[in-house]
């Protein structure tokens, strides 16, 4: 898409965001990082903290992180019965819901303070903006 539209000063990189070593490979300083739709996949907050700490280390001093949350879902059990685990053990998978308070505190541990949040009309999806302090 970037090449097709002849956009400049935009880059897309695909790495393992849960691996702390990933962030040492990134040779630029982003001013915006988007973390969307991945935290619900994992129960372990340590994995999330690897991501958040890595992002905070490379983020521009005036940078921001946009992150999504899914604190509730009306079809949680149905989703678990239909989707197998992404971990490959063939068992049903249950989405790890996190409250906004829990998500915000994970980001605040790395000096990223939530400034704004939007939530859909059903209270299922959130989009938050955190700025580096």
Kindly give the residue locations of the regions a language model identified.
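Helix-to-beta-strand junctions that scaffold the AdoMet/dcAdoMet cofactor pocket
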Residues: 7, 43, 59-61
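A short glycine-rich, Lys/Arg-flanked "PGG" loop and its adjoining helix->strand segment in the class I
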Residues: 48-61
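Conserved beta-strand signature within the Rossmann-like core of class I S-adenosyl-L-methionine
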Residues: 62-70
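S-adenosyl-L-methionine
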Residues: 1-25
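Short alpha-helix
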Residues: 93-111
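Short, glycine-/aromatic-enriched active-site segment of Class I SAM-dependent methyltransferases
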Residues: 76-93
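Core SAM-dependent methyltransferase catalytic element
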Residues: 110-133
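A conserved beta-strand element that flanks and buttresses the S-adenosyl-L-methionine
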Residues: 34-37
């Amino acid at each position: 898409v970037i090449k097709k539209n002849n956009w400049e000063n935009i880059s897309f990189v695909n790495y393992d965001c849960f691996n702390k070593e990933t962030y040492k490979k990134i040779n630029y300083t982003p001013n915006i990082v988007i973390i969307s739709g991945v935290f619900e996949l994992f129960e372990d907050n340590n994995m999330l903290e690897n991501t958040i700490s890595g992002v905070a280390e490379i983020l521009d001093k005036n940078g921001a992180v946009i992150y999504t949350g899914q604190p509730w879902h009306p079809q949680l059990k149905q989703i678990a019965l239909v989707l197998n685990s992404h971990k490959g053990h063939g068992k049903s998978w249950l989405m790890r819901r996190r409250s906004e308070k829990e998500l915000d505190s994970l980001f605040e541990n790395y000096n990223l303070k939530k400034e704004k949040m939007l939530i859909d009309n059903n209270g299922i999806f959130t989009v938050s903006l955190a700025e580096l302090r």
